[in-house]
């Protein structure tokens, strides 16, 4: 849990949801203000909630998750923050909304927030060459820190090579450059003009930011992300293997068996070193705080002057991607939504927000065996359902729409399921 000193920013939390933040500074040089959109202080309509709960329960079955935590904030209609399921098959303790968990690739946005903060302070240049700050990567002399943030460095990803080692030796502490080397060893793609999903790029960016600032990555995320938004349960933990907080959601994985996975006996992997993710996917949070961060980041609310625009130059998320699915700034742009999704051992997490209205969806599943697409599809399915919620009395719904339907992503989850729906009891 980050420590809030008297010189850091303080926040007053208004409204029913933790998203309604008004942040004020303590001294002239530290002054900072972020005001979230007004949020209707009531529950979302029952039929909307019922549809969303059915969507989450469906995704839990198909991914082998025993538990989930969800937050949906529709400023003009209401909120839905809930926990479903249990810690594991063996531990039938009910999941609660205050449990903390690993947020996976949402960490990438935090790392980019730090980059832009240091650039705004004149401590680093966005177009600085990577070797200026990271040793042993001389071949990246034409790659900039902004390329690392935007996913345009061309380097590969380490996870496909080392994921098995993470699961077999969760207590191992990895050096970021060692981990990144597995991605650097892959054939690069053309830099600058092509997005490539690369954990190695964000690992290198973390090292560069540490070198530029003289601070650790944990200290940087505390100073530039957690403290400004008063996120007391959000941090990049120390690398020693540990659970993600004092009240953690259990993280699980499924063992591979012939023809698929053993969905009846998830394996606990709650305790692991945060170094497997570091500044790519190592941070932890709670659902309320994840939603708060996602909304503020989408609105570029952590910066006094959002210029240059962090999300101004998106590229297709992959070859032949839909025109509304792009990536830049450590985030994915999905229609009007900005956010991230991904998995890390034990957890699959997604968080997306609309910068104009403040509409926000955040969700975590306590199983990481399915592809990271599953939790993205769930977040988008929930967003499609919630976007149709009627305005509360006295409110006016904005012009807000998504380029997909909830049915589309219900079917997409079905298509990539790693676990079958259990037979109905006779």
Question: Which residues fall in each region the model found?
Answer:
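Short, surface-exposed loop or secondary-structure junction motifs
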Residues: 142-337, 341-343
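Solvent-exposed, polar/charged alpha-helical surfaces in well-ordered, non-transmembrane soluble domains
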Residues: 50, 54-58, 93, 112-116, ...
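Secretory targeting and sorting signals
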Residues: 1-31
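Catalytic loop of the DD-peptidase/beta-lactamase superfamily, centered on the K-T-G motif
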Residues: 26-80, 268-426
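Structural recognition of the beta-strand scaffold that forms the well-ordered cores
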Residues: 69-71, 102, 147-149, 196, ...
């Amino acid at each position: 849990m980050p420590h809030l000193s008297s010189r850091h920013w303080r926040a007053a939390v208004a409204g029913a949801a933790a998203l309604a933040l008004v942040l004020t500074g303590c001294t002239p040089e530290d002054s900072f203000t972020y005001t979230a959109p007004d949020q209707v202080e009531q529950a979302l309509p029952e039929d909307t909630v019922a549809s969303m709960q059915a969507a989450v329960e469906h995704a839990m079955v198909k991914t082998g998750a025993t538990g989930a935590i969800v937050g949906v904030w529709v400023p003009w209609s209401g909120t839905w923050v809930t926990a479903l399921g249990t810690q594991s098959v063996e531990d039938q303790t009910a999941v609660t909304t205050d449990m903390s968990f690993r947020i996976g690739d949402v960490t990438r946005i935090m790392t980019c927030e730090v980059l832009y903060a240091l650039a705004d302070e004149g401590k680093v240049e966005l177009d600085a060459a990577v070797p200026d700050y990271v040793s042993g990567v001389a071949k990246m002399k034409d790659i900039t820190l902004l390329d690392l943030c935007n996913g345009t460095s061309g380097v590969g990803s380490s996870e496909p090579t080392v994921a098995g080692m993470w699961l077999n030796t969760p207590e191992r502490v990895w050096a970021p450059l060692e981990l990144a080397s597995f991605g650097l060893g892959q054939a690069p793609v053309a830099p600058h003009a092509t997005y490539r999903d690369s954990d190695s790029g964000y690992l290198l960016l973390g090292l560069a930011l540490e070198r530029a600032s003289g601070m650790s990555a944990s200290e940087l995320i505390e100073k530039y992300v957690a403290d400004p938004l008063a996120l007391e349960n959000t941090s990049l933990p120390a690398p020693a293997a540990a659970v993600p907080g004092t009240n953690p959601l259990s993280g699980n994985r499924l063992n591979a068996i012939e023809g698929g996975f053993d969905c009846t006996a998830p394996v606990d992997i709650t305790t692991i070193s945060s170094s497997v993710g570091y500044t790519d996917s190592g941070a932890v949070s709670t659902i309320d705080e994840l939603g708060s961060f996602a909304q503020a980041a989408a609105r570029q609310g952590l910066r006094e002057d959002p210029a240059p625009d962090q999300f101004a130059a998106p590229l297709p998320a992959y070859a032949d991607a839909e025109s509304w699915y792009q990536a830049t700034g450590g985030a994915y742009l999905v229609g009007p939504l900005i956010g991230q999704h991904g998995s890390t051992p034990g957890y699959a997490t997604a968080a997306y927000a609309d910068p104009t209205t403040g509409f926000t969806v955040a969700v975590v599943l306590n199983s990481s065996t399915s592809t990271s697409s599953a939790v993205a599809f769930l977040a988008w399915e929930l967003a499609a359902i919630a976007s149709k919620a009627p305005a509360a009395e006295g409110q006016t719904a904005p012009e807000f729409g998504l380029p997909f339907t909830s049915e589309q992503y219900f079917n997409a989850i079905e298509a990539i399921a790693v676990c079958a729906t259990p037979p109905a009891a006779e």
